[in-house]
Amino acid sequence: MNEKIELSLCDVLSLSKTPGERVTSLFELMQDHGQSFYDESVTQLEHALQAAHLAKTSHATMEQITAALLHDIGHFLMDEHDEQNHFLAEDWQHETVGAQQLAPFFGKAVTEPIFLHVPAKRYLCSVNADYFNGLSRASQRSYELQGGLMTDAEIAEFEQNPFHHTAVLLRRWDDGAKVKGLKVPDLQEYHTEVESCLEHS
């Protein structure tokens, strides 16, 4: 387990007796640990809610909406945020931490796009020369730390993943979810979707 993790999501969710309680515990964690700023525009929680809203208004599946809401859960768990001096100075692989912590409770339709949303940024930068210029300051800063341009072999490997299309969608929602002051539904809007995606009781 990554030594930077402040708390184990597995431990938190395992204490819940029902799927509904499990989602409530997850949302309480997000509420408690999501008030720090993701970048200069939005908090971690605001970013998650905006991403989920973009997914839902795009008529995404429940799994895609859940992945959008939880895609940065690794940042929540490792208390990564803009005010820390080391934030974006090193790559803590939040996508891997998040996917691993969610894997005991959600299927690959949720966890794999979360795992791939950072490679999806590298992929889009590699196949679309203009994509990088549209990224936020924080995403541009983290891009090189996360690997920079993909090789041809990495592009081919990414495209062979059955969830790569969803990962690209998630990346687009991620990029658009940084609007200061935007009013979107709160966490409870997504309780049904997230609970429906739980695979283990």
From Swiss-Prot:
One of its GO terms (molecular function) is metal ion binding. The keyword Iron applies. InterPro entries: HD_domain, OP_Dioxygenase. Keywords: Iron, Metal-binding, Oxidoreductase. Its EC number is 1.13.11.89. Fe cation 2 binds at D72, H94, H117. It catalyses: hydroxymethylphosphonate + O2 = formate + phosphate + 2 H(+); (1R)-(2-amino-1-hydroxyethyl)phosphonate + O2 = glycine + phosphate + 2 H(+); (1R)-(1-hydroxyethyl)phosphonate + O2 = acetate + phosphate + 2 H(+). Coiled coil: none annotated. Binds 2 iron ions per subunit. Its cofactor is Fe(2+). Fe cation 1 binds at H47, H71, D72, D174. It is an enzyme of class 1 (oxidoreductase). Part of an oxidative pathway for utilization of methylphosphonic acid as a phosphate source. Catalyzes the oxidation of hydroxymethylphosphonic acid to produce formate and phosphate. Can also use (1R)-(2-amino-1-hydroxyethyl)phosphonic acid and (R)-1-hydroxyethylphosphonic acid with similar catalytic efficiency. PANTHER family: HD DOMAIN-CONTAINING PROTEIN, PTHR40202. This is Hydroxymethylphosphonate dioxygenase.
